[in-house]
Regions:
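Active-site diphosphate/adenylate-binding microenvironment
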Residues: 4, 12-14, 18-34, 344-421, ...
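Thiamine diphosphate
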Residues: 102-104, 249, 299-301, 307-309, ...
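Conserved short loop/turn motifs at secondary-structure junctions
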Residues: 203-207, 358-359, 440-442
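A glycine-rich phosphate-binding loop feature that marks nucleotide/adenosyl-phosphate handling sites
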Residues: 153-157, 389-391, 536-538
Length: 548
């Protein structure tokens, strides 16, 4: 048995069914022989994104795996891996390396060294008979505590080394979580009960812990409104009366106003990272309760009054029991009053945006595309993701995600084009869902040729390209350069590219045809075809920013 065969047997025991990859790597042939489906991407960063999206939707119960060749293959994967690292996504990365006899030669790229700052752990297999121990450590670290990408480098001579089958003594690893200190929870629970205007901030830790039901129960016990971070979007049902919406660089008005008036802010499953894109800023003067599974989050950017360490589901259950012991059941009148306060803010805010959401202008306003999409697609049946820049800023405040993992939020590391790989991975994880990524023409230019991967590999996603032939999100930063050299101008017919790559594609220029085009595209995906809709849109650059 060769080392690569042993690795593939371990992958099978861990439930891995496909291997996102790009040659050359001996693992690809070994995986196919072992019955693991190789999915060949067109560019390594997208291949990582496929594994990333898969891991997010499965909450790490099945870990996405990506393998690539040494040198340029590993180098091309960098932005995909940094996205997974910044968003704490459990991934297993298996790059080939040079043979041990030459791996230390100057100028040879070493994945384990280069990726150390943007992975949870890196390790090289130095002895073939240690493959089980190395892979056991790798799978343990992907999901234990704060999840993250783990990289195992495989020297070329080790990859094909013969080992004894007795060396393959591998049992799938078990995940474990821990609760919080009971005294810490009791003290924080009393603070929450005494608060006049508490607000809950939920992060993606709630999603990975599969704790949305507990979060709803806690919110109703406290009559506390809930906002999520961008990565945490869908952790709390956004159609719930206590939902404020997603708090990020753009947000609905209720998020901004309720945070401003809060006396206590309870962060659960979030890192409280001060980041202009993914999280609403916490105003000064608040009492902060912070529950996280990573001690590095505590006091990172905000001074924490009540730090709590533990798994989000376990911690929420502890809070619920503590509150019931003190208070009993929830108060419907208080819940109703808070919900009414949210409506009083949300309705006029939404009314201000209705001219754009219902616009009949040509080129089509991108907000009209989003509005029509929300009308004709049941969000419970879909998984949606944005891309960087305008599509994210336009989609996030208005699209309501009602169920866990019905939206993939990302952007701590916000490389253009990331959404395409993520949505392919989501479709592989949840083939019954209508999986859609919204991207701009700039993002399509970065990764759009991997639409062919979706076509070739029978991954029937819908890619919506909002094409304004312009880099609109950077307008305020590029005035002089654009006036003199047209630096924001772009061009291209992306529906023609989609058809040329073998997919179903259509270009839409009439706002009255938006809804019917979306329905046609959905039917194409239901018939097993990857679909691309190109909407010719205006250079809309107004976003629902608060506090500017």
């Amino acid at each position: 048995m060769r080392v690569v065969d042993a690795i593939c047997e371990i992958l099978k025991r861990e439930g891995v069914e496909f291997l996102s990859c790009y040659p050359t790597n001996a693992l690809i042939e070994a995986a196919a022989t072992a019955g693991i489906r190789p999915i060949i991407c067109r560019q390594e960063r997208v291949g990582v994104g496929i594994s990333d999206g898969f891991s997010r939707i499965t909450n790490g119960h099945q870990v996405g795996v990506f393998t690539m060749q040494t040198g340029p293959g590993a180098e091309n994967a960098f932005s995909g891996i940094t996205t997974a690292y910044s968003d704490s996504v459990p991934l297993l990365l298996l790059p080939l390396d040079h043979a041990r006899s030459t791996s230390q030669v100057h100028h040879f790229f070493r994945s384990a060294q280069a990726y150390a700052p943007v992975t949870k752990w890196t390790e090289e297999i130095t002895l073939g008979n240690q493959v089980s121990a190395v892979m056991r450590r790798a799978f343990t670290l992907t999901n234990m505590g704060r999840p993250g990408p783990v990289l195992v480098e495989i020297p070329a001579d080790i990859a094909t080394e013969e080992i004894n089958e007795a060396d393959l003594n591998y049992t799938p690893v078990k995940r474990t979580v821990s609760g919080a200190n009971a005294k810490d929870v009791a003290a924080a629970a009393r603070v929450l009960l005494e608060a006049k205007a508490p607000v809950i901030v939920a992060g993606q830790g709630v999603l990975y812990a599969e704790a949305s039901e507990e979060l709803v129960e806690l919110a109703q016990l406290l009559a506390a409104p809930v906002t999520t971070t961008l990565e945490g979007k869908s952790a709390f049902p956004e159609n719930h009366p206590l939902s404020l919406g997603t708090g990020a660089g753009v947000m609905p008005l209720p998020v901004h106003e309720f945070l401003a008036k809060a006396d206590v802010v309870f962060g659960i499953g979030c890192s409280f990272t001060r980041h202009s894109i993914v999280a609403a800023p916490i105003p000064p003067g608040k009492i902060i309760i912070h529950a996280t599974n990573d001690e590095r989050d505590i006091n990172k950017h905000y001074s924490t009054d009540y730090p709590i360490l533990g798994d989000a589901k376990s911690v929420l259950r502890q809070f619920i029991e503590a509150l019931k012991d003190i208070q009993g059941t929830n108060d419907p009148k208080r819940n109703g009053a808070v919900a009414a306060g949210i409506r009083r803010l949300r309705e006029p805010w939404l009314s201000q945006w209705m001219p754009k959401l219902t616009s009949k202008e040509v080129p089509i306003n991108p907000y009209r595309v989003i509005s029509e999409f929300m009308k004709c697609v049941d969000p419970k049946d879909a998984i949606i993701t944005h891309d960087s820049g305008s599509p994210r800023n336009q989609l996030v405040p208005f699209y309501q995600a009602p169920t866990p993992r019905s939206y993939i939020g990302w952007s701590k590391s916000h490389a253009l084009g990331t959404g395409l790989g993520l949505i392919m991975g989501a479709k592989l994880a949840a083939p019954e869902k209508f999986c859609v990524n919204f991207m701009g023409d700039a993002a399509f230019g970065m990764t759009g040729l991997d639409f062919e991967t979706a076509v070739r590999c029978n991954i029937p996603i819908l890619t919506i390209v909002l094409n304004n032939n312009f880099i609109a999100a950077e307008t305020r930063h590029m005035k002089a350069s654009h006036e003199r050299y047209q630096t924001q101008a772009l061009g291209g017919n992306y529906s023609e590219i989609g058809r040329a790559l073998g997919g179903w594609a259509e270009r839409v220029e009439d706002p009255e045809q938006v809804a019917s085009a979306i329905q046609r595209a959905r039917r194409a995906t239901e018939n097993g075809k990857a679909a691309l809709l190109e909407f010719i849109t205006s250079r809309e650059s107004n976003y629902s920013r608060m506090g500017e």
